[in-house]
């Protein structure tokens, strides 16, 4: 049990994310009545419960019923990690190397 707790605490310290909550934007007429979050930056309406990656950054938007979350990888707290900056979020986030 001690080992599992220790490993969990280490992973918790190594893995972090950055989340910013945004108010929902007003939807254009064509999206009125659609259960989605309109994002003017991409001129797209993301269905509630889904995530869309940013085009040129390792971030994503997650649509919730009452808000839009802008999510990114956060900081890596280890010296050795791998990342694929060409992959869409969240696959572009750094991962600790064993």
Curated annotation (Swiss-Prot):
Molecular function GO terms recorded: toxin activity
GO cellular component, one term: extracellular region
Tissue: Expressed by the venom apparatus.
Keyword Nucleus: no
Keyword Signal annotated: yes
Compartments it resides in: Secreted
Key words of the record: Disulfide bond, Secreted, Signal, Toxin
Signal peptide coordinates: 1-17
Maturation and modification: Contains 4 disulfide bonds.
Family to which the UniProt record says this protein belongs: Belongs to the caterpillar 1 family.
UniProt function note: Probable toxin.
Name of this chain's protein: U-megalopygitoxin(1)-Mo1
Lineage: Eukaryota, Metazoa, Ecdysozoa, Arthropoda, Hexapoda
